[in-house]
Amino acid sequence: MKILVAMSGGVDSTVTAYKLKNLGHEVIGCYMKLHGKPNYHEENIKKVEKVANFLQIPYHILDLQEDFKNKVYMPFVDTYKEGKTPNPCALCNRFIKLGKLLEFAKNLGCEKLATGHYARLENNLIKTAVDESKDQSYFLASADKEALKYLIFPLGEMKKEDVKKFASTIEVLKSFATQKESSEICFVEDTYVQVLDQFMDTKIPGEVLDSSGKVVGKHEGYMHYTIGKRRGFEVRGTHEPHFVLKINPKQNQIIVGTKEELKISEFNLKNINLFIDAKELDCEVKIRYRSKSTPCKVEIYEDKSAKITLKDPVYGLASGQMAVFYNHDKVIASGFIE
């Protein structure tokens, strides 16, 4: 089978390419240039070239910087401007890795696209990885349903430690087993505020309000805060911990309250991405990558919006983040929180 492998220069994509080549497939590597971080690509391309030479496979360098800027980077900035919390990895998977890269794979005549994600596929549904600590099904849940039939995730049945051990047994790949893992958001060096600083003044002080609308303190600029944050702002007249409940970007205000006030039992989604045919779902939902799943009921409307009712309340639901719905270990839907 002719397979395009997304190669980043990391251990996961390297072992993915190695495994597929060893199974006798016709493997082609592809490195994506997504952003202009200095020296970032040069180092990674050297690693990809080293692996490609070792495996004796051709590789391509695909410049997707413009697409990435329009579909991932600027939406990241704009979402924070709106006082919401973005999910750039979900957008990147949908539009870039499982969008533009898949399109490139088809143009090369490849039957499949393989990535180093920790996830599995079963009956055209994304399934959680064997290694639960590294499972990436949450981020892949934004994928277009039609893309799934072209995908392969060779590491889905492996534990991360076994992937590293496997790489360390092969002389040429030993260095890949010990290299530092990449950060979750590839274009953020230290903090997301450093990215926002390039586009706006993030340090304009504003008012802190309680849930009744009373001014109780000051903050250092609304973009420094996300829902649930409990530090970095002033609250006068109380010793009880306070958390960010809401952000008003136009007024440069943050509304804070007690942990009890963070509780939410219902929320809405826009543009639900369904992997099964349904008008209602009785399932479990994850409201952020590292959160535990919570039982819920989902009502889906004609305009693809949805209302979610949780069995147990959750704390700190952030608008802009992705909610991912599971039936046991399979992803059945996803959508962005209103």
Curated annotation (Swiss-Prot):
Q: Which gene encodes it?
A: mnmA
- Name the UniProt record assigns to this protein: tRNA-specific 2-thiouridylase MnmA
Q: Which organism is it from?
A: Campylobacter jejuni subsp. doylei (strain ATCC BAA-1458 / RM4099 / 269.97)
Gene Ontology terms for molecular function: ATP binding; tRNA binding; tRNA-uridine 2-sulfurtransferase activity
Entry-linked InterPro entries? MnmA-like (IPR004506), MnmA-like_C (IPR046885), MnmA-like_central (IPR046884), MnmA-like_central_sf (IPR023382), Rossmann-like_a/b/a_fold (IPR014729)
Residues engaged in binding ATP: A6, M7, S8, G9, G10, V11, D12, S13, M32, G116
Provide GO CC annotations from the record: cytoplasm
> Where is this chain's protein located in or outside the cell?
Cytoplasm
- Which GO terms of type biological process are on file? tRNA wobble position uridine thiolation
Does Hydrolase appear among the keywords? no
What the protein does comes down to: Catalyzes the 2-thiolation of uridine at the wobble position (U34) of tRNA, leading to the formation of s(2)U34.
Per the record, the similarity remark reads: Belongs to the MnmA/TRMU family.
* Enzyme Commission number: 2.8.1.13
Q: Where is this region: Interaction with tRNA?
A: 134-136, 288-289
Which Gene3D superfamilies does this entry report, sorted A to Z?
A: Adenine nucleotide alpha hydrolases-like domains (2.30.30.280), HUPs (3.40.50.620), Translation factors (2.40.30.10)
Which reaction(s) does its UniProt entry say it catalyses?
Answer: S-sulfanyl-L-cysteinyl-[protein] + uridine(34) in tRNA + AH2 + ATP = 2-thiouridine(34) in tRNA + L-cysteinyl-[protein] + A + AMP + diphosphate + H(+)
Q: Does the keyword Nucleotide-binding apply?
A: yes
Q: Where is this site: Interaction with tRNA?
A: H117, Q321
